[in-house]
Amino acid sequence: MRILISGGRVIDPANGVDEIADILIEEGRVQSAKCKVQNDSTSHSSLLTSHSIDASGKLVVPGLIDMHVHLREPGHEYKETIQSGCAAAAAGGFTAVCAMPNTHPVNDNRQITEYILNKAKDAGLSRVYPVGAISKGLSGERLSEYGELKDAGVLAISDDGRPVINSRLMRRAMEYAKAFDLLIISHCEDPELATGGVMNEGALATRMGLTGIPNAVESIMVMRDIALCELTGARLHIAHVSTAESVRAIREAKKRGCPVTAETAPHYFTLTEDAVTGYNTHAKMNPPLRSDKDREAIREGLADGTIDAIVTDHAPHSLLEKDTEFDVAANGIIGLETSLGLSLKLVEQGVLSLNTLIEKMSVNPARILGLPIGLKVGNPADITIIDPDKVWTVKSEKFRSLSRNTPFNGWELKGQAVFTIVGGKICTA
């Protein structure tokens, strides 16, 4: 099927494009991206039989890519399935997501990787790129078979949800990953220092009678992994950056030429620890929401390029796992359907330009993962069309996700994906 997207503002930072243009899609790929598609050799009669999208007043951008999503399947289908997670992703404008390996069983082998890929194919929505486990069973004791995982379709490895505590094992993991050209996505947390903590350490935690988690829990491991990255030359990606100290360490490492990249999530540049006031478990996550100083450091890191990508860390949980005492409530929030609207606030507030935001949500994730970049002719037609002026209210009961654990319910946001096109197929509108 041919699709003609006409009259939209095409923003493709990878190819230096920011102009009103038409895009023609044929056989799942970008055939033409020009100001005057209708004047090329394609006949008007054939174009008239195509599906046509009037994108006037809309933004047409390379498909958004979320490098950090928990789809929960296999094992926790009551929280999310690959089908529902992909539906949520498509609704949020994401043409591709990376599925973290902390499933049950853990994705540490070919069979689980192929299961995830087959389920994603059956869903027929956003692309799913499985992330394999650094260690067998996320145990931190024995490395997974990286060659087998890569051959099955894994692009990166991670023990996300848990840190790799053993420095010797992490060094071996980096050396092994480098040999197979796999990205390591590191969950940076010192569990001994974090023991018992449920929110950011500080005056608010003291007043609430809760055990705090100091910033050093994250930054200590960030600095360790940067040192191992410099030692091994492996590609390292720091997950869910939340502290000023981590931003500073990553910035300095990049100046030294270290092959490290980093991500953060909208909750870390939008909220602070104040969101847990009243023991709001929908604002409980790991890493926890931090101080205003940390939030500002995250914004500065996004602005100066220290932080490469915006992800969701989409972590679905049932209401029973959230509607309980703060100490025992599950960590994590969902974000696939709110991320774009929250991230566009950075443009509205002058923190990022629109082009830079698209880099953080599409171009940079593609580059880090080794995927096709931008809307170049011949690339897969993975495209997100955004209405930047659409004002909408977050209503969790309308989410495509099976879960409702968001601290943003009731928020008014501006900007929303109106079409998500994956491989030339319209997945949502």
Walk through the language-model features, giving the residues of each.
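Divalent metal-coordination and catalytic microenvironments
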Residues: 8, 23, 28, 57, ...
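Alpha-helix-loop-beta-strand connector modules within alpha/beta enzyme cores
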Residues: 110-127, 175-186, 342
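Histidine/acidic residue-rich metal-binding segments in metalloenzymes
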Residues: 141-310
